[in-house]
Each structure stands twice: as C-alpha cells, then as structure tokens.
Amino acid sequence: IFFPPNHDPAKSLAPGLILFHGGNWVGGSLAQFRIACAYFASRGMVCATANYRMLTKAEAKKLPPGKSRKRVCVTDAKSAIRWFKQQAKELGLDPERLVIGGGSAGAHISALATLNPVLNDPADPQDVAIRPVAFLWFNPAFSPDDANDPEIDVQRHLRADMPPTLVFFGDKDPWKKGWDAVHAKMRSMEINAVEWHIESGQDHGFFNNEPFQTTTLHAADRFFTRLGLLNGEPTALPTR
C-alpha cells in the first residue's frame, strides 16, 4: 500500500487506486504497478497493487465444478477490493472515490470483479459494494473465448451506467481485437464515458517501459484530474 506524503488518516480521506497485475492469469508480479502506485500516491491517492491466486493447469483441473482459473482470479480480486474498502478509515481512504484497474489479465479481472455480481467469496461481507468511481485498463485481455463462460465474459456484464473508463493499447497488440469487440458493444449500449489511447507501432505491455510508462501515467493523471480526483499538473515519476 502506498500513501501520499504526510498523509494523516485522522484528518483527511484521499481518493484510492487499486491495480491488478497481468500475467495471463497464471503469473505476473505485484512489482508491475509499483511505479504507478508510488506515482499516484505522490499525487495524493492511497494506492495498492493486489495479487490473486495463479493456478497451474494441473491445479485448475482439480477445481470443483463451477470454478475455473479465471473465475478464481475474479473472486480473489473481489476479496482484495472489499478488504481495501473495509480498511478505508484506517488507511485514510475515501471508499466512494476508488479507481479500479490493471494490466492485461489484471484489467480483465478488475472489470469482472466489479461488473459481475456473482463469483463472490462467501466469507466476504457481501454488503461492501465494489463499484469504482472509474476504471483504468492497460491493454485489457478480453478474449472472444470468454463467451464460452458467461461469468468471465466482460461483454455479458457491461452496464449502461458504467463509470468513466480509460484504456491504453498498442495498435500491434493481438489482444486489441478483444477490446475492439467490447468497445463496439459499449457503443451499441450508448456507453460513452470511455477514453482510449492507441499507441502506434506498439505491442502488448508497451506501457511497462519508457517513454510509454510516463506518457500513460501522465494521461491517467489528467483523466483523474478531470474527474476531480487530483489537482494540478502531472509530475515526474519516481525512480525505480
């Protein structure tokens, strides 16, 4: 968890950000979004980068009926978001101003965790709402194959009252076709609060490296400012 400078939970509540790393639902690391979290904490947000169970194929085959590798990831993301919101007072977090997102598989997980009302852990407090004030998706891994399982198919769970959404993609990314299909469905539903940035000549994960890490985070900064979550101009990113 990353806090703003001189943050005092007893005196003020800051907007929040929780990001889920990518890794094809089987790998990846919390380290992916540490720079992003450190940056937005420096700008005034309480930030967290969250993990989830990453099952091998062998482990996934042992899951009981009604569960799958991706379903488990979504359930874990719901638990992480609920925990973050439950700790709002101690963290100095405004639970009504929480941005949720991630990269690749993490973006897919973040979408389903908030849009799909099921796949909850029964041990979690179901009365803790997990609707975000905005989405932040870095090349979200939305697959046409997900149509085979309605519970993990983002298109099945889009809602007309979707929160403002910011999306980044490289035009050489093979996953962009999945986003294009989801975006077309959003347009057909007149979901217009979507801003997307397509980087020419870039492939999957381009945002992890400079100069694109800076340009994408600064674009997200300006997006948050337009939503009233931040003030001022973007600043320099922290060093690694």
Per-segment meaning from a language model:
Residues 11-23:
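Short beta-strand element of the alpha/beta-hydrolase
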Residues 30-50:
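Short amphipathic alpha-helix adjacent to the substrate-entry channel of hydrolases
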